[in-house]
Every structure is written in structure tokens, then in C-alpha cells.
Amino acid sequence: CRKSLLQAVANLPYKGGNTLTGMALNFIRQQNFKTQAGMRPRARKIGVLITDGKSQDDVEAPSKKLKDEGVELFAIGIKNADEVELKMIATDPDDTHAYNVADFDSLSKIVDDLTINLCNSVKGPGDLEAPSNLVISERTHRSFRVSWTPPSDSVDRYKVEYYPVSGGKRQEFYVSRLETSTVLKDLKPETEYVVNVYSVVEDEYSEPLKGTEKTLPVPIVSLNIYDIGPTTMRVQWQPVGGATGYTVSYEPVKTTESTKPKEMRVGPTVNDVQLTDLLPSTEYEVTVQAVLHDLTSEPATAREMTLPLPRPQDVKLRDVTHSTMSVFWEPVLGKVRKYVVRYQTPEEDVKEVEVDRSRTSTSLKDLLSQTLYTVSVSAVYDEGESPPVTAQETTRPVPAPTNLRITEVTPESFRGTWDHGASDVSLYRITWAPFGSSDKMETILNGDENTLVFENLNPNTLYEVSVTAIYPDESESDDLTGSERTSPKSGPRNLQVYNATSNSLTVKWDPASGRVQKYRITYQPSRGEGNEQTTTIGGRQNSVVLQKLKPDTPYTITVSSLYPDGEGGRMTGRGKTKPLNTVRNLRVYDPSTSTLNVRWDHAEGNPRQYKLFYAPTAGGSEELVPIPGNTNYAILRNL
């Protein structure tokens, strides 16, 4: 029989033409694997396809029908055959049922393997009844349970065979005849397996009870984030059976920089880690994956936001003025580097002040008056800046000057003095005008001045005065107003005539009020014995010496004050010159044969000259010697 079979195979013709593999598969299904074609009942059905090219018709459907009818297909490709097509035709697993060689001579290289695999498939067909009703349950990512119904006849044991549909090592083990269920372990996650269960009696095997099932994916980790701080958080997950480790990755959800997630790997016994060096007030996405050798589970992802850094508390704004306010806050526990105080108006950019960590207050200066300020205080740490704590306050109106005082009033002027409203006044604007007049005078003073002399005023006129403070932000205070009347024009007072001589009188008076231009002095003998004479002196003087007067004569003297617009007033007094006086106490002494010494007391007044007359008592001519008025002695010689 063996000889005739080999002879029949050797005589098989090699027919050229089209490659219609699908048609050939349909042919053997319809013509060969039939009892009427000579197939023995319960015989193993094995088909071996040998082709040297890619089929021109469909092979998937015909090969599937054959497999569904229990035919075990081997596919052998030579030279131009399509390897993908061969694996599609062949029964799983591919490594024992699909072959591809470069040419016909290379067929010898696969003969041994092919023979073994064919023989293994042929073994034990007989009449042994196979198990039935294959049920696969209790699926996990690493295992599942296989159950079956035993055959009606007793068996010695069961053989369980399994391998991945996609190809891989075929594994098998035996189960006691008393068991009708077993668990396949150490499977690959999310992998479809072929399962064959055989009845075994001695060395005879039944047809396999076939089935397929897919393991579950690696379980998704049950993830929990807790114990969250400003820069840390803890991550915990439910352990996964069979895991060889875990990968924890994390990154901010929103970031301005393109950065890779940070990652840590931990062993299979660790299911709780702390993430450190995180950014405060930042949402993080945390992903945990279980690692099973070269496989990883689907990622379990959660998001959580770190807490903000501790911020100052109880911010208060006090001591508010038109340009300043003080900021107070409660200190922060922790490693604060400094505090930052920011403030702004709705129209201005933010300004900021840095404050040493040892202080909990600061003053804001140069603020705008009557303006709403938003003030915030933040604590700065090595890790970043805390959220701000804010407060609002409106600055006060700029203060006006106070206590306007008018002094030194004259007919043409007076002095105004006031107290500063604040220390930061830039300028003062002062206006004045007669009461009711719209024609106002104005001047500007520096902010450190607080007095002004108002000049060129009209006598006996009520004036209104207004003082306005102007501040650095150009805000103006309310007006400080006052009024004062200038003095009326006046004449001199308290006229005195004194220090009379035989030809002069001294006149003195108290000055008239206001800005006197001149004083006019008129004088003449009281009895009308001479013409009236006039002299003028400057307005700053208040005395004059009238000279070249007549001796022993009473004089009437009038002093008038002269203002720019006329005479202010006058005052009259009287004085009398002294009579002319001769010398007194004339003495002649120290005579000699030709000289005499003469001495006298000065005459009153201011004599310009003395005339000394002398003559012999016995008779003779009289001699005259002129003597200067400041000398009161002479020596008469040549007597």
C-alpha cells in the first residue's frame, strides 16, 4: 500500500496554467472529503496544499469552509507563493501548518518538520469519542477557565492544548479523567487563544474539542489622589495581580512650555507614591499604568490641583490720606522669602513694593487723591508666589491750607500768612481783588512758602484773598479765603521840634501809615516876618534839620505825607530859635613882656568864627584877630 501510494504521488502531473487555489480548495471539499468518495468514517481529515504562486481567486472563504468541516489544512508555497495567503489557508498555528520555500529543491529542508506535524495530526483517529460542549469562563488578563462535558465512554485522561491564534508556542498539559475543568494560566493579556481538548485512552487521542477565547486587557488601575499640598500630592492605586511594576507619569494640564511628563517607575509591591516639586495652584494630570513584562495596561488617569501657597491674612488699609495709606496684614507661617504689595487704580498700571519677610506692614505714597485703589498682598516662597489677598480704599480729598491771617496792614499793602494743609504741597495759587470785583490778581508760590505781602493796594479798600493748594497729582484743594481792609491814608503823627540853636531847629515825627513817597515840610516865622519855605525828604525818613533860621525867632512848622495819589495828611508844630550868644568866662593869663594868653568858654550853638579885638588901655589903635569857631583860645603877640 505504501509503495503504491508513493508511486501515485510520483506520477502526479505538474500542470501549468492559471493559479486558481480557491477553486482547488472547493473541489477537494466537495469531491474528496466524502464517504462516497471513499473516506472512512471518523477518519482524520487532512489537506496539504502545494502552490507556486498567488491565487487568482479568493482563498479565504473556501479554506474557512474546510476548516469549519474539521479539515486540518497544511499550506506549502514554492518560489512565487504569497506567504500571507498561505497563512490564511493553513490551520493555526502557522508555524506548524504554513511553509514557504525558495524553489522545489528546497522542499527537502522542510520534509522532516512537515512529516512530524502530519504524523502528529494523524495519530489516534480511531473511534475514540471526543469531549463536547466546550465552555470558557472566568476570563482575566492572565487566565481563563476551560470546561467540557465528558464523552459517554470512560477515558484515561484529557489532553488540553492551547496557543495564540496569531502564532506562538503550542503548550499542552494533561488533566485527570475525574476533572472536566481546568484554568489556563500565565496567558498574555488581550490575546486570542485556540484551545483543543482531547480524550485520551492509552496512546489513542480523539478528535479535538476546539474553541477560541481572548484574554482580557491588563486591568485599568483604580487611581486615587489624596494628601494634596502646594507642592506635593500622594497617588495610590489598587494593585494588579501579576504586575511586574508600575509607571507613574505626571505633568501640568496647562503649560506654556513644551515639556515631557515626569515619570517614575516602581516595583510590583508599591502602590502608593508621593509626587514632589510640583507647582502650586496648578492642575496636574497623573497617569498610572501597570507593567506586565513587555506589556502595559491601559492608562488610568486622574486630575487634581495642587493647593495654593499659604497667603497673608486679614489685610487692612489704615491711616488713609489724600496721597498715602498704610497696609497691614497677618504674617504667614512658613518659609516666606518676602512679601509683595501691589496697588493700582482702574486707570493706572500696577505698581508694586517689596517688603522684607520680617515686616507685616508698609506705607504707600504718592497716591492720587479721591481715587479708589485696589491693594493686594502676596507671600513669595522659593516655590513661587501665593495667591493675593486684596482690599480696596479710596484716598481722601487733598487738604486745604488753614488759618489765614492778615497782618501788617497799610493803606497800600498787607501781609497774608497761612498754615500748610499737608507737607507735599507743590504750589500755592493766591488770588486777590477788591470785594465784589471780578478783576482778580493772581500769583503762584512754591509749596514750601506760606506768606505773601500784597502790594499796590488801594487805601481804605476791602480786599478778598483766596489761597489754593496744588498737589503733585495736580489736584487742587478747596480755597482758603479771607478778607481785609487796607488802612486809610494818614499824615505824620507825634510831631516834635527840638534841639534849637540860634539858626536851626530839628523836626521829628512818627511816620504816616502806608507807602509814603515823600514828606513835605513847610516853615516860616510865626509873626509873619518872613516868607514861607518848603523842603521835601524821602518817605522812609522821619526827621529833618531846618537851618539858616533867624535867631530868637518862633517858627510854625507843618509836615505833610505825600502818597502816589496825593497828600495823606499833615501835622503842624512850633519851635523857636535861640538868641545869638557871646562867649563866657573870658580869661587873660600868663602875660609876658610881649604876649598875653586869652581863653574863653564856647558860645552856644555852632559858631563859625570868633573875632578877638584888643587895644592898649593907655590908648592906641584896636587890633582884630579872627579865630575859627571850633577854637576857644588865642595868644596875642608883639605887644
Curated annotation (Swiss-Prot):
InterPro entries: ECM_Regulatory_Proteins (IPR050991), FN3_dom (IPR003961), FN3_sf (IPR036116), Ig-like_fold (IPR013783), VWF_A (IPR002035), vWFA_dom_sf (IPR036465). Residues 473-496 are annotated as: Disordered. Its main location: secreted. It is found in: Secreted, Extracellular space, Extracellular matrix. Keywords: Cell adhesion, Collagen, Disulfide bond, Extracellular matrix, Glycoprotein, Hydroxylation, Repeat, Secreted. Type XII collagen interacts with type I collagen-containing fibrils, the COL1 domain could be associated with the surface of the fibrils, and the COL2 and NC3 domains may be localized in the perifibrillar matrix. GO terms for biological process: cell adhesion. This is Collagen alpha-1(XII) chain. The keyword Disulfide bond applies. Residues 1-114 form the VWFA domain. It holds the Pfam family fn3. It comes from the Eukaryota. Trimer of identical chains each containing 190 kDa of non-triple-helical sequences. One of its GO terms (cellular component) is collagen trimer. It comes from Oryctolagus cuniculus. Residues 130-219, 220-310, 311-401, 402-490, 491-585, 586-639 form the Fibronectin type-III domain. PROSITE patterns: FN3 (PS50853), VWFA (PS50234). The keyword Repeat applies. Belongs to the fibril-associated collagens with interrupted helices (FACIT) family. The triple-helical tail is stabilized by disulfide bonds at each end. Prolines at the third position of the tripeptide repeating unit (G-X-Y) are hydroxylated in some or all of the chains.
